[in-house]
Amino acid sequence: VYDPEYVARFYDNYGEREWERLVVDPVQRVSFEVHKRLFHEYVKAGDRVLEAGSGPGRFTLELARMGARIIVGDISPEQLRLHREKTMEIERSIEERVVVDVVDLSRFADGEFDAVVCYGGPISYVLERADDAVAELLRVTRRGGYLLLSVMSLVGSVRIFFSYFPDLVATHGWDLAVGKVIRTGLLTSEINNGHVLRLYRWRELREMLERHPCRIIAASAANFLVNGNEEAFEEDQRWLEEEIAACREPGALDGGTHIVAVVQRT
């Protein structure tokens, strides 16, 4: 069951590491670029943008450089404090920073934003309330505007972290360590160091989005090629363009660490 206080505490304690996470290694840097390229396609200068689950502001800096006007929201007060510290150079682009939960955006009016960006973990962390979160994110997006979101990928994560599973099976048994994860996408606290989140197949994300007033415009994996090939990406930046192209192939959508989707509010 979704526990917003737990998520807030987790990210309060995670602190500065969230700022470093997106640049700490080639995999994270490639993921950042894949996500960033999509909002460069669907957010334009002058747009009023809600960034829901902003963290300390890596994506905010990019949105500001594009000329967007940004309302910053995060469930973690500590992440918002870091955000204020890390984004002082773009303060004129930020209308406000607010503590907010993606399942309840009632402080905002219907159709208030030209675009909404919800990248990273928020949809995966709200567990059984994911539909509520999508409904709220779309409600505050104007008709014809875009919602850009990402979730953590089930199939891709199993593929990438496969070497961990034998030890998990030895400790927790097949049904809990593998069977439950594959069937439900739920990473429980027992096998994930106290951390609970939901991983998605592309089919599951697509079906959820199709229950709401929107149409899917674009979809992408993140980190389809780079995992296990980090050295090549470090040595030759041209691989980045191949990664971005490969991630958008239909057959690749389930193969990365995240699944990114762009939908248009109808």
Where are these predicted regions, by residue range?
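Acceptor-substrate binding/catalytic loop of class I
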Residues: S189-E204
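Class I SAM-dependent methyltransferase SAM/SAH-binding core
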Residues: R58-D104
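A C-terminal cap/extension of S-adenosyl-L-methionine-dependent methyltransferases
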Residues: E207, I217-T266
